[in-house]
Amino acid sequence: MLMSAVILLSGSLLDPNPGLIFWTAITFVLVLLILKKIAWGPILGALEEREKGIQSSIDRAYGAKEEAEAILRQNKETLAKAEAESDRIIREGREFADKIRAEITEKAHTESQKMIGAAKDEIEQEKRRALDVLRNEVADLAVRGAEKIIRASLDGEVQRKVVDSMIADLSTKQN
């Protein structure tokens, strides 16, 4: 109770006191002026420096992103060119291999035809030689037979002996 009596005597705390308001306002203004002179400049400077640092980091990040995108585009273009070049080289290699294969096949075919032709010619020549040799032997045998027949009489028994001797001569020559 004593407290409430003291409050009643001095007035209420919510009653405006012009002297208190005046000195509170002057104190507030003085504190603001002191803070402005001493602390406000460094605080604002630090905030501006921090803002500039953040903006610089953001700008560098955008620059790095754009540079990375440019490098990525360049790498994609280089990769596409390399793939196109490798496809071209593979295609040219296949075309060259097909061309070489066709040339080799054609050359082998031509060579085999030449060999077959040469073999046929050689066989034909050997056949002619064999026929010539056979004709010569037959002619020789006929001449000898005629010679023996002319020397001997045309008796049947003599003819038989001449033919037998020619057959024997022919058999001995073949062996």
Swiss-Prot record:
F-type ATPases have 2 components, F(1) - the catalytic core - and F(0) - the membrane proton channel. F(1) has five subunits: alpha(3), beta(3), gamma(1), delta(1), epsilon(1). F(0) has four main subunits: a(1), b(2) and c(10-14). The alpha and beta chains form an alternating ring which encloses part of the gamma chain. F(1) is attached to F(0) by a central stalk formed by the gamma and epsilon chains, while a peripheral stalk is formed by the delta and b chains. F(1)F(0) ATP synthase produces ATP from ADP in the presence of a proton or sodium gradient. F-type ATPases consist of two structural domains, F(1) containing the extramembraneous catalytic core and F(0) containing the membrane proton channel, linked together by a central stalk and a peripheral stalk. During catalysis, ATP synthesis in the catalytic domain of F(1) is coupled via a rotary mechanism of the central stalk subunits to proton translocation. Component of the F(0) channel, it forms part of the peripheral stalk, linking F(1) to F(0). GO terms for cellular component: plasma membrane; proton-transporting ATP synthase complex. It comes from the Bacteria. The keyword Cell membrane applies. Belongs to the ATPase B chain family. This is ATP synthase subunit b. The keyword DNA repair does not apply. Keywords: ATP synthesis, Cell inner membrane, Cell membrane, CF(0), Hydrogen ion transport, Ion transport, Membrane, Transmembrane, Transmembrane helix, Transport. It is found in: Cell inner membrane. GO terms for molecular function: proton-transporting ATP synthase activity, rotational mechanism; proton-transporting ATPase activity, rotational mechanism. The chain crosses the membrane at residues 20-40. It is a single-pass membrane protein. Its main location: membrane.
